[in-house]
């Protein structure tokens, strides 16, 4: 099979975004180099629904990945798509604060309480609803849009 040449990758059609998962820094670079409009990634902790051994990012890799993607015109979303523990929501809030400080373009969230935190503390941050949020009707989707933009 022929290897993809990043300079030969056709642009994504107008109005569409190619959003790709990035479970590691090499995967992020491959997605960016092969035409991704956006990559999404997660931390190696309980804030990430895909927290599997050998995957995901520490803070240094996230910083490198964000820089790499942004230098090439690609957006970066961080998935904080699990539900905070009722007795200890601080790690999820801290992860969102860190994501903002590192320059992510948006966060992907499941928990409405964390969405509210994001809307209140980071009003310019784009919030995306994760599939773990389970908005399965037009009414649910409209609720999220009305509450969080």
Indicate where each model-derived feature is located:
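Non-catalytic helical/linker scaffolds that mediate oligomerization, partner binding
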Residues: 1-149
